[in-house]
Amino acid sequence: MGKKNKSNGGGNTNNTPTKTPSKPPVKFNDKWASIENGEAKSASVSHYKEPSKEPKFVHPAKLAKEKKIFDGLDIPERVLAHGKVVEQNGGKKRRHREISPKMEAKKPKVESKSKDGVAAKKAHKHFTVSSEVVQSTYFFEEPDNGNEVTLVSNGKETTIEKTVILDEEVEDEEIDEEEFEDEEEVEDEEGMDEDETEIDESEMIVDPKDIERCIEFEDVDDEDEMEDEEEFEDEEEVEDEEVDDEEEEEVADEERGEEQEDEQEEEEEVSDEESVVSEMDADSDDEGFIAGKDREAHVISKDKAARTFAAKPVDFDAFPFNDQDSVVTASRAFGFMVSPCDVQTFFDKFYQSNVLVVHRKTPAYYGNLFSTTRFSELLEKHYLEYNMNINIAQYKDGIRTTLNGKGRVYPQIVKQHLHNLCSVQLVNPQTFDDRIWYLCEILQEQFGCFVGANTYLTPAGSSGFAPHWDEIDAFLLQVEGRKYWRVWAPESAEEELPLESSGNFTEDDMKGKEPVFEGWIEQGDMIYIPRGYTHQARTDKKVHSLHVTVSTGRQWSFANLMEKVIPEAVGALTEERHKLRRGLPIGLFDMGGVVDLDYSQEEHFTEKFKIVVDRHMSRLRNLVADHLLDSSVDSMTKEFMKQALPPILTDKEKKRSVIGLSTNLLGDDLIDFCANTKVKFIRKHTQRLLMESEDSCFISHRMNNSRLFEGRPETLVDFPSTGIDTYRVLWNAYPEWRTLDEIFSCRETKSNTRKEKLAAIQILFQMGVLLVKNPK
């Protein structure tokens, strides 16, 4: 509610008509009297340029407020670790709105009464004030005539008749409510476009005591204004006209200062925005989630699939998907696996969201990828152990049983288990079988993470595993026989995309749950089961089943990235920010806890603990977002280099690399690094250049990795900083070859000597990531 005008010519305070004196007495600092004497100043000058000379009344409620330490608006810049200083714009919370010459000053909305007696809206209380005197607009009452008011707008005076209409205090029973509402709508529309509709000054009727002038701020919340008005509602009756906008601005500044302590570098706008974003993100977690049976698996029929398949079976010994670009190779292999669904459609429609089933009319579609015969050969030739390489399982009468022995697994023992209707799982076939190694290794370039495999041999009329979900995305390739599958979608957002596999469910657990897919997967077919989908299968009573599961995405999520980034960020912020190293507040144990107790210092919980923690978290978030996202990508890439399968090389690649092929150790055919020697990386993602500091770097690569998951320590090789430009040229040129002359003479490497460039090339070759082709 606006403040009442207490000027000597402005009427009484109880809003009842009185007789106007012929000439009001002039008091000290009477600004309305100065108009009469010809000494009038604009409203912006008189109310905002000159402070009051009379003592101001301060309400006791204001005196009881805690004093602020600072207002938080003097922050010149924000300093963060691991990056340059970022200058701030000083904030916008109390920025005065300036009116340019091209912008017309806002006209006040006032009460008016038309000739037909219909009242318009109540007077608007907030106006935009220009710093320019010529654009000021104000009203004053004629001292000799209490029934007239003079409007002064840009130096032009207009005398109009006064009709007193009070805010929310007078109801005109003669006014028709429908006409009043219609008039409001019309004036609202007119007020929205001031350029189209001009206010008729002759119809403007207003009482000066109903006018309140205030500065319009861009970012002051309505809630803060309501608090100001409620706080000074009682003050209005005793306060004179000098309680103006300068005092209101001071009160508003104090309220903002209460939410800050001694953090002059903190921007409250940023933290407020982050809170809103966080709440919106939390609210959107469940948005769009489709539970359980409402999801639909997409099934591609045999008739549709038959038109896309080549008649000739694939020979995995011949590296069928190879291209000079390893990323293209990966895309070809993945396209073969999910065909006839194209790669982009799969990632748009199915990846980590829906089941995809592909039925094919070609039983030999997967060629010589894997077979029961090949499994027997691996058992005979390799030392495969229980638990590490082989699991024996049986699911009977709703109970899953593991029947693993100890030591090496022999073919004859496996045969006995199969005869007893047990399922045999080969945990890591890529370690022993080159064909599965080839498929998994090249798919790593597609997914950017470790890709592994399992094989499951299950005799006819049996089942080896109870219903469960896995922590990986699974592509099940049916290479022999057939299997009957049931797949259930997650029933809540909490079950979506788990990072750990589930335990075994019973048949009772699955009762009442409708699967999204239930049916046979035949030889040559494929089914994709997203992470977190519960599944269970059984074989035909007359036919055994052998399928290869290609798995990806294990522990490769945003959560895993955050687990790496946050500790690094906390360490970096702790080094830079001494306030993060301060001790916890005294009496913290008595401020709060999970259990609802009568904590003696609970009133200090927000001020001493919560606000401080929120401030540190805001700085932590800014540090991660502004300076650690790039390094987080490097961290995950380094993790990939440690876990990933090594590349499987063709004979030609072996011959051109440091590995060699049928190398004559006593021969004279040495690899020569001359001007016409051509070089390129073996794969796009076999190596990664990482920065340890501004002038120190190293390379992490997977050339020497074990085919057993993390079977060897990661390989890290120091790399000279003078070779960074050479590395960059090779990276940008991939998959094309570049001669040494092209590398040495290009603009990117001109800052390095020829010796430094050659040294970088030789280091890359010696660590095994470079292919070299000598001129003939």
UniProtKB/Swiss-Prot annotation:
Its main location: nucleus. Residues 425-569 form the JmjC domain. Fe cation binds at residues 468, 470, 535. It is found in: Nucleus. Keywords: Chromatin regulator, Dioxygenase, Iron, Metal-binding, Nucleus, Oxidoreductase, Repressor, Transcription, Transcription regulation. Its cofactor is Fe(2+). It comes from the Eukaryota. It holds the Pfam family JmjC_2. Binds 1 Fe(2+) ion per subunit. One of its GO terms (cellular component) is nucleolus. The keyword Phosphoprotein does not apply. One of its GO terms (biological process) is response to osmotic stress. GO terms for molecular function: 2-oxoglutarate-dependent dioxygenase activity; histone H3K36 demethylase activity; histone H3K36me/H3K36me2 demethylase activity; histone H3K4 demethylase activity; histone H3K4me/H3K4me2/H3K4me3 demethylase activity; iron ion binding. Residues 166-204, 217-288 have a biased composition (Acidic residues). Residues 47-57, 98-119, 206-216 have a biased composition (Basic and acidic residues). Its EC number is 1.14.11.-, 1.14.11.27. The keyword Lyase does not apply. Gene3D superfamilies: 3.90.930.40, Cupin, JmjC domain-containing ribosomal oxygenase (ROX), dimer domain. Belongs to the ROX family. NO66 subfamily. Oxygenase that can act as both a histone lysine demethylase and a ribosomal histidine hydroxylase. Specifically demethylates 'Lys-4' (H3K4me) and 'Lys-36' (H3K36me) of histone H3, thereby playing a central role in histone code. This is Bifunctional lysine-specific demethylase and histidyl-hydroxylase NO66.
